[in-house]
């Protein structure tokens, strides 16, 4: 199993993530609606919005998975935040990086995985939108375009929420 490396900007990325004050927060109805829609559009077992903390990936929204987090060192999403594009594994059992990963050999029995980074306004990869299934497959070009659209919706929402909180803090300090 290949453990994900740390991004070169890891300290700044974590600082940016923590500034969003989104880790370990209550479920968000809007984000849950988006992941539920994605689950139906892509016909996959699991859809997650995963935020990559120092030693774990925490799921802000999840469809088809009971766990609220998993260790970062076995995460697929930890690999995604190292790049800026779609990361797709058509069959994890056939990929040497993941074939013996406990998320492949045990529950949730990942075979298909695709993730795309979710960025902050500063450009940090905070986490991912990912699709998971228990059988091999490959996204079509149309599905890849839809995945980018879903990511953009989520990313814009997270950025707007953060900017609204920042604005409110400024307004509160003025009054």
Segments the model singles out, each with a brief description of its role:
Residues 1-71:
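Intrinsically disordered, low-complexity terminal regulatory regions
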Residues 111-120:
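A short, aliphatic-rich beta-strand micro-motif
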Residues 128-137:
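Short beta-strand-to-loop transition segments that serve as allosteric relay/switch motifs
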């Amino acid at each position: 199993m290949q453990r994900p490396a740390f991004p070169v900007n890891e300290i700044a990325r974590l600082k940016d993530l923590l500034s969003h004050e989104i880790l370990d927060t209550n479920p968000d109805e809007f984000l849950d609606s988006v992941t539920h829609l994605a689950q139906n559009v892509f016909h996959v077992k699991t859809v997650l919005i995963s935020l990559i903390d120092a030693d774990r990936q925490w799921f802000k929204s999840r469809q088809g998975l009971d766990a609220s987090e998993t260790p970062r060192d076995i995460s697929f999403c930890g690999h995604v935040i190292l790049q800026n594009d779609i990361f797709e594994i058509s069959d994890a059992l056939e990929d040497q990086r993941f074939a013996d990963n406990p998320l492949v050999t045990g529950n949730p029995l990942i075979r298909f995985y695709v993730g795309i980074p979710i960025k902050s306004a500063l450009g940090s990869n905070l986490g991912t939108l990912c699709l998971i299934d228990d059988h091999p497959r490959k996204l079509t070009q149309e599905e890849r375009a839809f995945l980018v659209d879903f990511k953009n919706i989520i990313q814009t929402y997270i950025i707007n929420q953060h900017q609204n909180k920042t604005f409110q803090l400024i307004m509160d300090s003025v009054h």
